[in-house]
Amino acid sequence: RDWRREQERRQERR
């Protein structure tokens, strides 16, 4: 799993 992608997606939480 890529925890890095999850962190970037968390920042785009609308």
UniProtKB/Swiss-Prot annotation:
GO BP terms: negative regulation of translation
Domain of life: Eukaryota
Note: IC(50) of 320 pM in rabbit reticulocyte.
Function: Inhibits cell-free translation in rabbit reticulocyte lysate system.
Protein name as it appears in the record: Beta-benincasin
Source organism of the structure: Benincasa hispida (Wax gourd)
